[in-house]
Each structure stands twice: as C-alpha cells, then as structure tokens.
C-alpha cells in the first residue's frame, strides 16, 4: 500500500479513523508503516463544522476506508505516471483560461481584493511591471499576475509593491552587454517576501530567497515569458463583457473528446479495468468489447461539427466550413457525411480531383449513399468540361465515361460524350471500348467504386439548370451554320449547390436530441409560413372575377330570393289586415294576438281539473271561457256600452269544452258572456294603486306589463270603498279577495274552510245582502255540506274608498286571526314580503279632485276607525 496516501487520509479524518484502523487491522499496522506521528491540523480545522447528525455517516465511511485499504491505497494504481517531458508536452493540449475573477463583477471591491490577496503566500512567484524609481533606491512596481501553476489576476488591484535595492539582484544588461538600471514599463519576475492583505502592501525580492531552483531566473524578463492566460486578456477591459462559460466553449481544446491523454497524464491506462474490486481487475476478453459503441460515440461528436460546416457552406463561409469539416474528420475519419460535404466544398471551389477523392472514400464506406453518387457524377461532368476547355479530349472522354458508369442515365454526360464522338478530333483520340461508350454496364476499373445505379435514376435524369452550354453544342452549331456562341466562364459553369436532402436530414435527425438546430428550424418554418401567406394573398388579389361568377350557383340564389320575397309579401299582407281591423273596430279593444305555440304557462292545468266535474255555475262559466278568468258580475254588465262585434277570424273562434252535469251526462258548457274589450272612458274614479297580488298560479310567471294589464282587465274582484284619511299623505292598503281556481279545486281536502275569513277583504266592511241575481241553490247529494254558494263565494265587500281596485286574491293559507286595520300586511307562510314596496291607493273623484283631499268623515266610520287603531 502507499503509505503517503494513508498518512494524508489519517490527517484529514483524524483520531476517529486511527481508532477504527487499529480495531480493524491491528494496533501494530500503523507503526509498521511508520505513521506514529501524524499531523492532525487539517482535522482540527474541520472539526469546528461537524454536526452530531452526521456522526453515523462519518463512522461508516471510516469503517469502509479501513476495511478496503488494500484496494484503495494500492501502489499499482499510480505506478504508470508519465515522464516529465510528456507531461510538459501535454500541457499544451489543455485550455488556458483566464482566472474566474477576471469575469467577476463584485460590488464590494475592497472585500474582493482582500480575499484574493489572502490566497497569496510567501514564496509565490509573480510578474510585475515597473512604475517608477522612488527615493532611497526603492523600486515601485505594479503586480500583474502569478506564475503557473497558480492562476491569479492582480492587475486590477491597486497594490503598493516595493522592491528594496538589497533585493534587486544583478542589474540587467543592455544590447552592448553593459549593466543598466531598471526603467519604467520593464517586466520583472519577483518573489513575495511579506504580504499584508489588510493594508494592500507587498514586499518583493528578485534573488530567490525561498525558491532555490536553478532553472528559474528572476529579474528582467520578456513579454513572451508571461503566462498564456494573461497574454490573452492583458488588452481586455476588466470585468470582461463575455461570460466564462462562453469563453470555455469557444476553446478548441475543450471540444476535443480524446480523453486517453488525460488518463496517461494522471498515471492511468485507458484500456485497463479500474475497479476497487480485485476480482474485476482481470478484465474482459478484447473480442467482447463493442467497437460499434465507440464508433457511434465518435460519430455523434463528429456530426455536431458536420452540421456547423454545412451551415457555413450554405451561408458562403467556406473557410469556416472547411475548419468544421476537418475537425469532424479528425474525430471520426469514417464519417460519410463529412466526406460528402467536404467533397462538395472542394468541387464548388474548383478542386475537382480533391472532391473526387472524398466522394470515392464515402462510396467505399457506403456504396449506396445517394448524395455521394449524385455529387460525384456532377463533379465528373464539371471535370470533363474543364478538360474540353484545355483541349484535353482524352481526359474529358474518360471523365464522361466514368460519370456514365456511375450514373448511366445522366443526360448531360451522354450528350457531351456523343458530341465528342461526332467531332473529328475526338474520333481519332477516343479509345474505342464498347462497354464504356454504351454506359449500360458498370466498370470496376473506373475511378468510381460504385456498383449500384438503381437509387439515383431520378436524380440523374433531370439536368441541372445552372450548368452552362457544353463544348459539343458549339461544334453542333458550327455544322448547322448558325451563329457561334461564346463559351461561358469555367468557374460559373462548374459551380453547383449542395442539395439539402439526405445529408442535412440525417444530420438533423441525429442532432434532434441535442436540440442544437431547433432555432434554425423554427426560423425556416416561419419563413415558409410567411411565403405561403403572401402567395395566398396574391392569389386572392389576382383571382379573376369571372372565375368567381362561374362558381356561383344562380339557381340556389334565385330560390333564396323567392323565399325572401314571399316572406316580405306575407308580412305586408298581415300588416295591412291589422291596420284595417284597427280602423274598423279596434278602438274599443285591440285585436287578439295570432295563435302561438303553447307555453308552459298556458299548457299547465289548474288544480280543479284533476278533481273531476264541477256542479257550480261559476265553474261552468270558467270552463266555457277557457279557464282564463271568470265573467264579471251581472251588475256591471250593463254599465258599459257593448262594442260593435268585430268580424272574428278563424283562429279567434274558441270551441266550447264538454262538461259533466249533476246526473253525470256530458254536455257542451254554457257559453260565457264576453268581456268588455278595452277600458271605459267614463268619469268614474279609477284606482292608481298597485295592489300586490299574491296569486301563486299566474302572477309569478308573467312580466310586470302583463301583470298590470291583468290587474286592470281581468280582475273579478272589485271593491268600492270610501277612504276617509286624516292626512293628505295617508296611504291605504286595498287587499281584496280574488277568485283563484286553486282555492276551489280541492273540495274534499280537510281544513279547506279553516281560513275562510282570510279570503275576504282586509278593509273594514259591512256584509252585503244575498245577490238577487244568483239564487242560493238547494242541497245536492254530490256536494259536501257547508259548501258556499256562488253568491256568497264571490261576494264583494264594501271598502271605504271609492276606488275600483282590481287585484288578484291573496294566498289561500293565511293565519286565521290577523290584525284587520289598514296598516296590516299579509305575511303568511307562503307569501313573499317586500317591506320596501307598498301599494298606494289613490282615488280620483268624479269632479277631478284627489281622494286625499280632506272630506268630512261620517260619524260611524270615524268611530270605527278610532276603535281599530286602539285595537292595533
């Protein structure tokens, strides 16, 4: 085992490791190694930051080090350290980066300077620059940087560094060999005597007090002797505008994946099996190693450079493209895509022979590569043309023949070869070989190494558009007698562009996971979208209007037009009918609306429809009238003038429903007397009050306008009262009952007449005598006892205001004994109460005066009123 490494481990882990070592390996093991006196200074510094929670982890780690000491500290692991000469040579392969503080911008600069100066120690070698010669033969210098291997940038720190004359050493010599004194801007190699980080002072010497190395020379030195990292940044501003990572990625050494040298510099062999388990160090047989994995890794590294080279090639940056492609081939010499791209680059620059060499290598590795065959054929044609211009007909014929051997259907090569055959000069020089002239068979003796031509027929069948007129065309024109055409420049004729088909697609497929070219793809996609939008706009703008007219279906348009005209005519006829009807008899009552679809409100049956046939006259009248509202009292039928009967339309005639009489026979219901349409314009007093209707069946479903019209038209309850208010602003609540079909439907429900009193008017009233018109009926076996007669059921009450208030009845279920004064509000269990909305009963007298005017109240009425107020 390596005793030095064990001593360093003991000094780092301290006495706990020593105790465990003695327990595991014996007490005399360390004594035999000569490790009786170990320096535990490092452990004592680390001990300050230990925590109790990590005590178990430290114990396990110490046990592992003691048990596996033979594997961890084996001497054979570091026995193959390279020689110093090889190490010195390997230093040039490493990236020389500027110190990290050069890129760092610290807010507290003083604190940063003190931290960097604290890293310097006595005896370190630094490079300085002379600023001036002070009195007393003191040399004032400015520190620049430290010598390798320590990298520290000191040029931005305002340090006062002094070199006394006693520590100058020998003076430098001039060109004649005479000693001279130090001058400004001289670069000196010095050694640190004393350092004070707080005061930022340095004391230097040039005699080597601490470093007794004969090869190291102090004193005057040249700028070339400065470290490489400083020579790169001495002209740059501090802090640097670029980032540390960007500079690292730019370095050529950083992109070199060859790690074998790094292994050797550290004494490790790359082909050895390095393991802490001894039985795994024997290794595996060489034939079991997967060379394909290593090749795949190298090709992935190379494809990055290939992609960059292709991008430079397309942008016209040929120098950068060559650098990237050469770098890719250095990493992976068998990279076919790099060979094809570099061959195309050579051919585009006019170096046809070099390009053909790269194409042949690519086809040797992959003889079915489409781009390699295609580009090689184009290069051979361009080479043949250049030979024709130089009047080297034999070489031109051979180039065209090689192209036809590679691509038998190449049209330009065949035409050029035929033209050379027809020329007299070419017939004497061309060697006759039928296999080469026909081009139907492939020759292995040609310059190309391909044997398959099935995959390039489509690409070779179409000639390039940028290829100029060949040599045979000029000869042909001479024989026909036409004008002679000038020969186009050879460079322009031989140029061809690199197609973006398999090469770029394969490169991008392999680099898709690395996502290096995603931005370029997005930009290209945006450009394509813009072009498509522009094309669509231009198409829409330049589209012929005649074509648009051809696309129109005129029959469908006429059909739609006829529909619209018919609908407008029917609307006009309907409007004309309504106007004529209004002129004839519509002043008294507006025409009824046309039949509409049944809504949920109209289609819903009332509660008394589910019970059975009714024997009362009022129920018959309601059924005959359609169930909307009962007829008015007979007393008021004669007070209004009957309007002239308007001609009824077919949809206005209502059919009378069937009704079951007392004997159980079905008969037509008796027709109800029609309602008086419109409002009478008599001088009677009209109520302006808004009586709150609590009807559960209709008023909640109707709107405000419909509700108000129903209150004024269809109310079957009319109460007349004379209001005698003490104040002009006194408002009375007119709460009169209204016939609700719901309250008469369930005849046989227990407790139906429990709240009979609540259906009467809340106002203080006197009972009327039975109506002489509606006679009281005789008892019937089909009607339960104590059923109210129609006369008493729809009896009106006299209120004390001469207002005709039309309102629906309140809800059926109310409390039995409610306060009966005019200020009481119906707050039953099923009613909705709004305390902010109160119905105001305001009556207009026939003479035009307000009901609120002070009138002398009757005596009886006044007494009754005072009595009610006392009870309230």
Curated annotation (Swiss-Prot):
Question: Sorted alphabetically, which keywords does the UniProt record give?
Answer: Phosphoprotein, Repeat, TPR repeat
Query: Where are the compositionally biased (Low complexity) regions?
Result: 442-453, 735-747
Task: Cite the record's Basic residues compositional bias ranges.
Answer: 515-537, 685-734, 753-778, 793-814
User: Compositional bias (Basic and acidic residues) spans?
Assistant: 419-431, 538-562, 569-587, 860-872
In the record, Phosphothreonine modifications are located at 538
Q: Which SMART domains match?
A: TPR
Looking up InterPro entries in the UniProt record yields: TPR-like_helical_dom_sf, TPR_rpt, TTC14
- Comp. bias regions, Polar residues: 432-441, 600-618
Give the signal peptide range.
none
Note down the stretches annotated as region Disordered. 419-468, 494-872
TPR repeat start-end pairs: 302-335, 336-369, 377-410
Record's Gene3D superfamilies?
A: Tetratricopeptide repeat domain (1.25.40.10)
Which residues are annotated as modified residue Phosphoserine in the UniProt record? 536, 540, 606-607, 769, 771, 778, 780
Family label: Belongs to the TTC14 family.
Which protein, by its recorded name, is this?
Tetratricopeptide repeat protein 14 homolog
């Amino acid at each position: 085992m390596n005793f030095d490494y064990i001593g360093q481990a003991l000094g780092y882990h301290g006495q706990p490791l020593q105790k465990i070592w003695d327990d595991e390996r014996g007490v005399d093991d360390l004594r035999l190694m000569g490790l009786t006196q170990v320096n535990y200074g490092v452990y004592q510094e680390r001990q300050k930051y230990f925590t109790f929670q990590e005590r178990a982890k430290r114990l396990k780690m110490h046990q592992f080090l003691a048990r596996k000491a033979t594997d961890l500290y084996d001497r054979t692991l570091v026995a193959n350290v390279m020689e110093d000469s090889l190490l010195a040579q390997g230093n040039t392969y490493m990236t020389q980066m500027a110190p990290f503080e050069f890129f760092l911008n610290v807010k507290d600069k003083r604190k940063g300077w003190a931290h960097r100066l604290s890293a310097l120690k006595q005896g370190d070698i630094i490079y300085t620059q002379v600023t001036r010669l002070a009195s007393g033969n003191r040399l004032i210098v400015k520190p620049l940087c430290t010598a390798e291997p320590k990298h520290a940038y000191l040029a931005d720190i305002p340090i006062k560094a002094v070199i006394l004359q006693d520590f100058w050493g020998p003076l430098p010599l001039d060109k004649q060999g005479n000693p001279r004194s130090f001058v400004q801007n001289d670069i000196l190699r010095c050694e640190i005597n004393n350092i004070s980080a707080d005061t930022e002072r340095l004391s230097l010497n040039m005699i080597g007090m601490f470093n007794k190395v004969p090869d190291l020379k102090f004193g005057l030195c040249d700028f070339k002797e400065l470290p490489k990292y400083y020579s790169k940044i001495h002209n740059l501003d501090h802090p640097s505008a670029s980032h540390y990572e960007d500079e690292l990625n730019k370095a050529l050494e950083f992109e070199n994946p060859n790690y074998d040298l790094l292994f050797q510099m550290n004494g490790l062999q790359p082909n050895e099996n390095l393991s802490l388990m001894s039985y795994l160090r024997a290794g595996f047989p060489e034939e079991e190693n997967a060379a394909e994995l290593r090749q795949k890794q190298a090709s992935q590294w190379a494809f990055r450079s290939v992609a960059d080279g292709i991008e430079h090639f397309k942008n016209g940056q040929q120098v950068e493209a060559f650098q990237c492609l050469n770098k890719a081939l250095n990493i992976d010499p068998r990279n076919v895509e790099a060979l094809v791209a570099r061959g195309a680059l050579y051919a585009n620059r006019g170096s046809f022979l070099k390009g053909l060499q790269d194409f042949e290598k690519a086809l040797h590795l992959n003889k079915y590569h489409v781009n390699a065959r295609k580009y090689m054929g184009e290069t051979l044609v361009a080479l043949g043309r250049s030979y024709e211009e130089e009047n080297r007909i034999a070489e031109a014929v051979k180039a065209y023949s090689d192209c036809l051997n590679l691509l038998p259907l190449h049209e330009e090569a065949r035409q050029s070869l035929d033209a050379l055959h027809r020329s007299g000069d070419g017939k004497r020089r061309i060697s006759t070989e039928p296999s080469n002239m026909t081009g139907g068979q492939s020759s292995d003796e040609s310059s190309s190494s391909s044997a398959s031509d099935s995959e390039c027929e489509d690409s070779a069948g179409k000639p390039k558009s940028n290829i100029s007129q060949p040599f045979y065309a000029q000869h042909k024109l001479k024989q026909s007698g036409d004008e002679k055409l000038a020969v186009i420049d050879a460079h322009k004729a031989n140029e061809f562009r690199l197609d973006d088909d398999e090469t770029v697609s394969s490169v991008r497929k392999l680099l898709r996971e690395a996502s290096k070219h995603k931005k370029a793809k997005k930009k290209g996609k945006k450009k394509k979208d813009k072009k498509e939008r522009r094309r669509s706009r231009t198409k829409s703008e330049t589209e012929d209007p005649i074509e648009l007219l051809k696309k129109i279906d005129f029959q469908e348009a006429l059909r739609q037009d006829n529909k619209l005209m018919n609908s407008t005519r029917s609307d006009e006829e309907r409007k004309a009918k309504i106007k004529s009807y209004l002129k004839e008899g519509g002043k008294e009552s507006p025409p009824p609306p046309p039949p509409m679809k049944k809504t949920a409100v109209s289609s819903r049956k009332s509660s008394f429809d589910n019970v059975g046939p009714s024997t009362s006259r009022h129920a018959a009248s309601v059924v005959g009238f359609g169930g909307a509202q009962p007829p008015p009292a007979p007393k008021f039928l004669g007070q209004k003038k009957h309007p002239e009967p308007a001609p009824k339309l077919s949809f206005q005639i209502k059919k009378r429903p069937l009704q079951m009489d007392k004997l159980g026979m079905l008969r037509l219901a008796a027709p109800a007397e029609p309602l008086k349409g419109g409002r009478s314009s008599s001088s009677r007093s009209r109520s302006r009050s808004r009586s709150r209707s609590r009807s559960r069946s209709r008023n909640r479903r109707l709107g405000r306008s419909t509700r108000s019209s129903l209150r004024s038209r269809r109310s079957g309850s009319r109460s007349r009262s004379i209001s005698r208010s003490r104040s002009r602003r006194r408002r009375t609540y007119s709460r009169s009952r209204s016939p609700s079909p719901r309250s008469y439907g369930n005849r046989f429900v227990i407790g139906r007449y429990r709240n009979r009193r609540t259906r009467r008017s809340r106002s203080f009233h006197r009972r009327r005598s039975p109506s002489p018109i509606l006679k009281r009926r005789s008892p019937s076996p089909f009607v339960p006892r104590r059923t109210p007669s129609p006369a008493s059921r729809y009896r009106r009450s006299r209120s004390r205001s001469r207002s005709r208030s039309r309102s629906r009845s309140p809800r059926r279920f109310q409390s039995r004994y409610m306060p009966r004064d005019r200020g009481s509000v119906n707050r039953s269990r099923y009613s909705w109460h709004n305390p902010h909305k109160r119905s105001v009963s305001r009556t207009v007298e026939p003479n035009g005066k307000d009901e609120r005017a002070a009138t002398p109240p009757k005596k009886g009425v006044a007494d009754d009123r005072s009595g009610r107020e006392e009870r309230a």
